[in-house]
Amino acid sequence: MNLYDVIKKPVITESSMAQLEAGKYVFEVDTRAHKLLIKQAVEAAFEGVKVANVNTINVKPKAKRVGRYTGFTNKTKKAIITLTADSKAIELFGAEAE
């Protein structure tokens, strides 16, 4: 698996924005990715970033209805990335509109 295929997108929610102050960033990642691969992908994608810890969450599929038919959403995996104290911040999350 290519390192640039591991990270799919950032998770922008109220709780993930609250974790930014603690140096934690939340990404949706490939379901086959393990913690070491996620750490390598984040350090390769963002220059000057050092990862201290990676926590992963497997999100189960939810049942959805379309008319009379019931289906399921895709399962996903989220990774909470904790940076070291001497690491640069990831600018993707800190960009605020002025």
From Swiss-Prot:
Part of the 50S ribosomal subunit. Contacts protein L29, and trigger factor when it is bound to the ribosome. One of its GO terms (molecular function) is structural constituent of ribosome. Coiled coil: none annotated. Keywords: Ribonucleoprotein, Ribosomal protein, RNA-binding, rRNA-binding. GO terms for biological process: translation. The gene is rplW. This is Large ribosomal subunit protein uL23. NCBIfam families: PRK05738.2-1, PRK05738.2-4. The keyword Metal-binding does not apply. Pfam families: Ribosomal_L23 (PF00276). Signal peptide: none annotated. One of its GO terms (cellular component) is ribonucleoprotein complex. Belongs to the universal ribosomal protein uL23 family. PROSITE patterns: RIBOSOMAL_L23 (PS00050). The keyword Aminoacyl-tRNA synthetase does not apply. Gene3D superfamilies: 3.30.70.330. One of the early assembly proteins it binds 23S rRNA. One of the proteins that surrounds the polypeptide exit tunnel on the outside of the ribosome. Forms the main docking site for trigger factor binding to the ribosome.
